[in-house]
């Protein structure tokens, strides 16, 4: 076994997946790839609250909140405001991803993993996980059986369900 990937979203189940994947990587000497996929969907209420409570200073310093011109055509102003909102949402998710990856790398190294690669990607979680697992020639893939998704995920099919059924490598869904 040369390469193990763990998909992380900050949920308790993905944290357990990290521990298990780290233990196996440490014992086998495999490289551990930590993956976090950033959604391009609008922020959830929970994410907006987290942004206000935990990340407000970092967001304020990285974005120019006064960058939206209040003059001109209302439609153009509205488009600029929507783009600004999308930029703020993306930057917030980037900050979450960077913090999650930094903490996860430290945990993996603390469990004896020597080689850790971090990957932050935008896009559809299931599709991105599958594409990268194949492209990076991953031997084993770990992910939480239940992530931070909403109730819609129960109806549409969860990321772990899709990945488990379509992955070309060993796939471990951790509960």
Predicted regions and their residues:
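Structural beta-alpha unit
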Residues: 74-141
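Short, conserved glycine- and acidic-residue-centered signature motifs
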Residues: 14, 93, 97, 156-160
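A structural preference for short, hydrophobic beta-strand core positions in alpha/beta folds
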Residues: 34, 117-120, 173
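A structural micro-motif
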Residues: 30, 114-116, 169
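Small/aliphatic-rich secondary-structure junction motif
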Residues: 2-83, 111
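Absolute protein N-terminus
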Residues: 1-2, 175
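Gly/Ser-rich helix-loop-strand patches that form or flank binding pockets
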Residues: 23, 126-175
